[in-house]
């Protein structure tokens, strides 16, 4: 039986319920500590970085992989 992974989009939708960087970091730390599957961890990291970019751009939403390069300089 194949294991089902949460996709980047799945994690992004979960992270979009959060409107502050502080709360995002709390959820990120929790998931980072509890996830064990490498694919899930990679997808979660990608989605968290994506959400950080959305938050630093004033809450503007971007499709996965479509964050403007100019926004990334503000993501820590």
Curated annotation (Swiss-Prot):
InterPro entries: Hemolysn_expr_modulating_HHA (IPR007985), HHA_sf (IPR036666). Disruption phenotype: No effect on expression of pathogenicity island 2 (SPI-2) which is usually repressed in culture; derepression of SPI-2 in double hha-ydgT deletions. Double hha-ydgT deletion mutants lead to deregulation of many genes at least 2-fold, most of which are also deregulated in an hns deletion, suggesting there are a large number of hns-regulated genes whose expression is also modulated by Hha and/or YdgT. Upon infection of C57BL/6 mice a single hha mutant has 10-100-fold reduced virulence compared to wild-type, while a double hha-ydgT deletion is 6 orders of magnitude less virulent. SUPFAM superfamilies: Hemolysin expression modulating protein HHA. Signal peptide: none annotated. Belongs to the Hha/YmoA/Cnu family. NCBIfam families: PRK10391.1 (NF007703). This is Transcription modulator YdgT. The lineage of its organism: Bacteria, Pseudomonadati, Pseudomonadota, Gammaproteobacteria, Enterobacterales.
């Amino acid at each position: 039986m194949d294991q089902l992974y949460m996709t980047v989009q799945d994690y992004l939708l979960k992270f979009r319920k959060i409107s502050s960087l502080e709360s995002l970091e709390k959820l990120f730390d929790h998931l980072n500590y509890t996830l064990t599957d490498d694919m899930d961890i990679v997808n979660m990291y990608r989605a968290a970085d994506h959400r950080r970019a959305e938050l630093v751009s004033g809450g503007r939403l971007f499709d996965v992989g479509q964050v403007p390069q100019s926004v990334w300089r503000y993501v820590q």
